[in-house]
Amino acid sequence: MAIQIILNFILAFIWIFLSGSYTLNNLLLGFILGLGFVYLFSRILPGRFYFIKIYKILKLAVVFFVELLKANIDVLKIVLQPKLKNEPGFFVYHTDLKTDWQIVLLSNLITLTPGTVVLGISDDRKKIYIHSIDFSTKEEEVEGIKSSLEKVVREVGED
């Protein structure tokens, strides 16, 4: 993947030097042309086409920011209520992620969303212990994490 990125930037700079126009637009055009060239030769270059990984990382960022916005609104509703009706609770989340960095990334994303804190990870790396500020049902919490954050973390980790 690193070879493909370096090759893409080299092709972009070659394009700038050959065209003689040293503008940002020309650099962007050279980058896009280089991206097409790298895509055409991705079968003979080592690794998968790198732009797919970048797309997955951007998708992870978008999903996280959507979850962050939803969690902020939920916590704001709890805080602005005249009488607190939230039910905090602990639960165990069973994850299917395999690598340590994926589990740590998921744990950090869960902790960064307001209203949830990861307390720990089991020794077998299969369970994540979570505290939620408003714990309605375990199934809702687990499904929310599994369908959004864990799904995109798994996609980023796939080769």
From Swiss-Prot:
GO terms for molecular function: antiporter activity; monoatomic cation transmembrane transporter activity. It is found in: Cell membrane. It is a multi-pass membrane protein. The keyword Protein biosynthesis does not apply. The keyword Transmembrane helix applies. Keywords: Antiport, Cell membrane, Hydrogen ion transport, Ion transport, Membrane, Sodium, Sodium transport, Transmembrane, Transmembrane helix, Transport. One of its GO terms (cellular component) is plasma membrane. It comes from the Bacteria. The chain crosses the membrane at residues 1-21, 27-47, 49-69, 101-121. GO terms for biological process: proton transmembrane transport; sodium ion transport. PANTHER family: NA(+)/H(+) ANTIPORTER SUBUNIT E1, NA(+)_H(+) ANTIPORTER SUBUNIT E1. Mnh complex is a Na(+)/H(+) antiporter involved in Na(+) excretion. May form a heterooligomeric complex that consists of seven subunits: mnhA1, mnhB1, mnhC1, mnhD1, mnhE1, mnhF1 and mnhG1. Belongs to the CPA3 antiporters (TC 2.A.63) subunit E family. This is Na(+)/H(+) antiporter subunit E1. It comes from Staphylococcus haemolyticus (strain JCSC1435). The lineage of its organism: Bacteria, Bacillati, Bacillota, Bacilli, Bacillales. The gene is mnhE1.
